[in-house]
Amino acid sequence: RIFIINPKKYEITGYIQVPDMTMESGSTEQMVQYGKYVYCNCWSYQNRIIKIDTETDQVVDELKVGIQPTSLVMDCNNKMWTVTDGGYEGSPYGYEAPSLYRIDAETFTVEKQFKFKLGDWPSEVQLNGERDKLYWINKDIWCMDVNAARVPVRPFLEYSGTIYYGLTVNPANGEVYIADAIDYQQQGKIYRYSPDGELLDEFYVGIIPGAFCWK
């Protein structure tokens, strides 16, 4: 279930029950809002985007996508984007080629599905400040216009033999930040790139850097 919190008082004021989900068979991950509705991707052993009415705090609809949608963002055209990881070989929930989905927020329907190869592991879908360019990790770092008809052939940044583990874009200037877990044991590193892919800076942080948040 999803907890509702009063940010001024730091108090839990209620919760939203998610149908067909237990602690062992699902997780709610990221959220975006369109009008009075909040949308949330359900990841672990799930394949759904749920739609929540903020006036009633109830799940009112759901949309099936591929296995395990990992991210959720809303672009400048009011289109939601999610990417699935496809599960893993031997998973009791299934294993399939992952996909990137474009979903119309108004109709809550899938408009476009971009399929990856079986064994790919796309993640960390992000948008720039104008919300017209999409970024994600799939071994390399990829960038695509939100109106594109197909996934680009060449990556924004090529794989460099390390572990890209987190990704964000500065909403003010379009600079791309990449978290490198290196080997999951030593201090990780952050790389800062220009919107054109030029390395501007790099610095060490804590072990396994995996997420960013802009003030």
PLM segments and residue spans:
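A short beta-strand motif characteristic of beta-propeller blades
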Residues: E11-T22, Q58-K64, T109-K117, R150-Y159, ...
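Repeated scaffold domains used in trafficking and secretory/extracellular systems
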Residues: M23-V32, I67-D75, G119-G129, G161-V169, ...
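Loop-centered beta-sheet repeat module
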Residues: Y34-D85
